[in-house]
Amino acid sequence: MATTHLTAALALLCALLQVDIEASSWWSLAMNPVQIPEAYIVGAQPLCSQLPGLSPGQKKLCQLYQDHMPYIGEGAKTGIKECQYQFRHRRWNCSTVDNASVFGRVMQIGSRETAFTYSISAAGVVNAVSRACREGELSTCGCSRAARPKDLQRDWLWGGCGDNLEYGYRFAKEFVDAREREKIHTKGSYESSRTLMNIHNNEAGRRTVYNLADAACKCHGVSGSCSLKTCWLQLADFRKVGDFLKEKYDSAASMRLNARGKLVQVNSRFNPPTTNDLVYVDTSPDYCVRNESTGSLGTQGRLCNKTSEGMDGCELMCCGRGYDQFKTVQTERCHCKFHWCCYVKCKKCTEIVDQFVCK
């Protein structure tokens, strides 16, 4: 009898370990900045074997492009921060957890939220690698060689050192999609649909960065006159990328696998999603209450806006459970005056503010 219980316990432990392994992600590079060793130390473990969350294919790319790894981590961090900004007033607010999965079990569900997270993190890598190329931080790329835009005025020069979107896009595609492409699933399985979903949303994120990049120009001339302009390709502010993908989140398409193993739209009356749209295969879990099986952290203790009727309002954020009120003291600069020459002097003002948190 004891042997039976021991066997069952070991089986459960192995299953839990397997879930943890599968849930680990390259996103974890955002939580622990990658340090490239300046010199090789005899007996030291290779860098790539020490990095958590990398798939076999990603480890191979790491070995070939070690100098890229800090920027992959930087891109993931940029994506996570933007995700948290975009969802700061939602029940699910892109919270991270303290393990290699970064977002916990909630990413094991193929929901709209998962779709956004995959897209914004892939976008972050394109952003970081493209800029690193321009700044001369990587050994295999440099300034952009993008063709001159057709709508650029004839007398403006196309040159300078632009962000290398072409390289950033290609490398992000190879690295981020490596985990998905090396998976082998039974045709028609749920796992197969998740892989297709992830690849689609990764691509949507990358294309958003690529498509939003635009020409930036600098004037040249005597006494600041703009008799000549030099222009180059420049990344859009990442907030624009986040705003665009948040709109795509709101209009994301519900998908299912067809008999041929392809993702098709559940509601065929709508236009099929393009490569710029987000797709999902599962309905979102209930984010109102904490649930370890789905990874939902719930909204208990979240700040809410008593006067808002939107998602940040106490009625919706607290899911009808009610809220508690407390007072906080806030200090800010006030009564600022400019003094000649040349500084601004301010006083400090304090006020007592009512705040509300979900029960």
Swiss-Prot record:
UniProt entry keywords in alphabetical sequence: Developmental protein, Disulfide bond, Extracellular matrix, Glycoprotein, Lipoprotein, Secreted, Signal, Wnt signaling pathway
Protein family: Belongs to the Wnt family.
Major subcellular site: secreted
Gene Ontology CC: one annotated term: extracellular space
Keyword Disulfide bond: yes
Residues glycosylated per entry: N93, N99, N291, N305
Residue positions bearing lipid (O-palmitoleoyl serine): S223
Organism encoding this protein: Ambystoma mexicanum
Signal sequence region: 1-20
Record's protein name: Protein Wnt-5a
Any one biological process term the GO annotation gives: neuron differentiation
Highest taxon, organism lineage: Eukaryota
Location in the cell: Secreted, Extracellular space, Extracellular matrix; Secreted
Organism phylogeny: Eukaryota, Metazoa, Chordata, Craniata, Vertebrata
